[in-house]
Amino acid sequence: MSSMTNAEAIDVRYSRISHLIGLKRYKEATEEAEALLRDEPEDDQAYALLALIYVHTEQYDAALHWSSESLKRDPENRLAWLVRTNAYHDSDKLDKALDAATEGMRVDPYEPHYYFIRANIYLKRGRYAEAKSYIETALDIRPNNAAYMASLSYAEALLGNHAASRQHAREALNLSVESDTTFLILAWSAEQRGDYEENLNMLKEAIRLDPNDKQIREAYMEGLQKSYKMYRILLAPFTLFKRMKPWQVLLIWLGAAIIFRPLLLIFIIVYVLTHWLTKLLVHVKLFGWSFKK
């Protein structure tokens, strides 16, 4: 039996690192990647894998550094461009994320995650129709991805197409992938449609799968607050303002301050009291009367 070649041995080490990342055993994955780099200091894929670990551990500066080292050795390393796009997106450097995605799409035009990232950015910027188009492209490439289908549901909800949104939400759930990301996006979609019970159910599933994720925990707490109808009623104007341009919001506030000043003051006081009361009720529901940090 012939012995394994050096290239085959390196491929086995790549697979080992990827497997550890999939298991969220990031410390071991880092040790394996660093050991590989000691043996193969010019291995662009090893640098890209190390960068990927740092994205997963939310150390975005390190992820950008090591992906840059990978691209110095191979300017078209596919994983390195994907890591850079995610690192910029997750650290809220959205313009740089778009630039990285553009370059990544040139290198790997059939990678659906670039279209997904662009869609997420356009959703954040209120460009819902463009976002929907990018999500549909991602689904054309990978039709069985539950997170992409959930994002299409969210985009449809933001566009006011609630029937289509519910249909895509069902399709995402039928893909039967246990993913905290998918459940979180479906929760956003349900909230946008006004399906608050469904919103809370999806958040419960997300937090079950990843109870330590800060974004999911915060969304779950907010979901519990919004389960109180009075809070939702008072929150409605602020939800509407999010869809408006800043100058429109300013004009409405100025007009309300001039015409309805006493009522506006009462509304603000009631809103603040309701916000903190529901926050207290949620805390007591989850943790009892203990307020220790």
Language-model regions, residue ranges each:
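Short coil turns that delineate tetratricopeptide repeat
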Residues: 41, 75, 109, 143-144, ...
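Alpha-helical linker/edge segments of TPR/alpha-solenoid repeat scaffolds
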Residues: 196, 222-246
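Canonical positions in the second alpha-helix
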Residues: 35-36, 69-71, 103-105, 137-139, ...
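Register position in tetratricopeptide repeats
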Residues: 22-23, 56-57, 90-91, 124-125, ...
